[in-house]
C-alpha cells in the first residue's frame, strides 16, 4: 500500500546519528514511501552516516555556515535528482559557553554563531532550494519550547529558536504564492547529541518527562510521523505554524 509520501523526494538536513530527531524523521518518511536525500556537514559526519544509512540513500555535502556551500549543495541535488517535494531542516548549533550561566554575559560572537547556524540557515536553504521546489512542496524545521520560555541552561539557543520561528512565518508568506508551505515542529526534549551538550541535561530531560501528560517522553519516531504529515498533501492548509509534538509539555 502506498504511503502518504509515495512519489515524493525529500531532503533531510541534520542527521548526526541514529538518536537524532532528524533520523527519526527520516525513518518516518521512508516508511511513508518518500525517497530521501541526506546532507552532511563534513567527512567525519559522512562516515558516521555511512555506518547506518542504506547505501542507496544519496548523501550530499552541505555546510550551512557558508552560503556558497548551500547553493552548491542544492545545485548538485537539482542536477542529480531534479525538483524536490520538501526539506526537513534539523540544524542548530551554539557555543556551549552561551548556554550556561547568565544570558547577559552572551558575547557578540556567540550570539552571531548561534543565530547564523540555527536560524539564518533556514533562510539560506529556502533561497537555494526555491527554484527546485515543486508546487505543493513543504519545508519543516525543528524548534523547542525554550523559544518562548526562559529554560535553564538553554539561553542563546532559546533566542535562536525564537528567531527561527519568526523566519518560518516570513518564509511562509514569501513562498506561499508558489504553493510552498513552511512550518515548524516544537519537539519535546529527547536525549540526542544536541541535548547532551546542554549543562545538566539530565535534569532537563527529567523535568520534561515529568511534564508530559502520560509521564513518558516523546519518541523521535513520533516527531517524525508529524513531520511526514506536514510534508504530505494532507496538510496543504497549514503554513507558518509551530506544531507542538511534546506530549503536552507546553500545556504547563
Q: Can you say where each PLM-predicted feature lies in the sequence?
A:
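Short, small/polar-rich loop/turn modules that mediate ligand/substrate recognition or access, typified
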Residues: 176, 181, 238-240
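Short C-terminal tail/terminal secondary-structure segment
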Residues: 228, 239-252
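Rossmann-fold cofactor-recognition segment
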Residues: 53-68
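Conserved SDR Rossmann-fold cofactor-binding beta-strand/turn motif
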Residues: 181-191, 231, 244-246
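A glycine/serine/threonine-rich, flexible loop-to-helix segment
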Residues: 50-52, 177, 189-212, 222, ...
Amino acid at each position: 500500500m502506498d504511503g502518504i509520501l509515495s512519489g515524493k523526494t525529500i531532503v533531510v538536513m541534520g542527521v548526526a546519528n541514529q538518536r537524532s530527531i532528524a533520523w527519526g524523521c527520516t525513518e518516518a518518511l521512508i516508511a511513508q514511501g518518500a525517497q530521501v536525500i541526506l546532507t552532511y556537514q563534513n567527512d567525519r559526519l559522512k562516515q558516521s552516516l555511512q555506518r547506518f544509512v542504506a547505501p542507496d540513500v544519496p548523501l550530499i555535502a552541505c555546510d550551512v555556515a557558508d552560503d556558497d556551500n548551500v547553493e552548491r549543495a542544492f545545485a548538485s541535488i537539482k542536477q542529480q535528482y531534479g525538483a524536490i517535494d520538501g526539506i526537513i531542516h534539523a540544524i542548530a548549533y551554539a557555543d556551549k559557553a552561551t548556554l550556561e550561566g547568565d544570558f547577559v554575559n552572551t558575547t557578540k560572537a556567540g550570539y552571531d554563531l548561534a543565530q547564523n547556524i540555527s536560524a539564518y540557515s533556514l533562510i539560506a536553504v529556502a533561497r537555494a532550494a526555491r527554484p527546485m521546489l515543486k508546487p505543493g512542496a513543504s519545508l519543516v524545521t525543528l524548534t523547542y519550547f525554550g523559544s518562548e520560555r526562559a529554560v535553564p541552561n538553554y539561553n542563546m539557543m532559546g533566542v535562536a529558536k525564537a528567531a527561527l520561528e519568526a523566519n518560518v512565518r516570513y518564509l511562509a508568506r514569501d513562498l506561499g504564492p508558489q504553493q510552498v508551505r513552511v512550518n515548524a515542529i516544537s519537539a519535546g526534549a529527547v536525549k540526542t547529541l544536541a541535548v547532551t551538550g546542554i549543562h545538566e541535561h539530565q535534569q532537563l530531560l527529567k523535568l520534561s518527562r515529568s511534564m508530559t501528560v502520560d509521564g513518558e517522553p516523546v519518541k523521535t519516531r513520533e516527531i517524525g510521523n508529524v513531520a511526514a504529515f506536514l510534508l504530505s498533501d494532507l496538510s496543504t492548509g497549514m503554513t507558518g505554524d509551530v506544531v507542538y509534538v511534546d506530549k503536552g509539555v507546553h500545556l504547563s
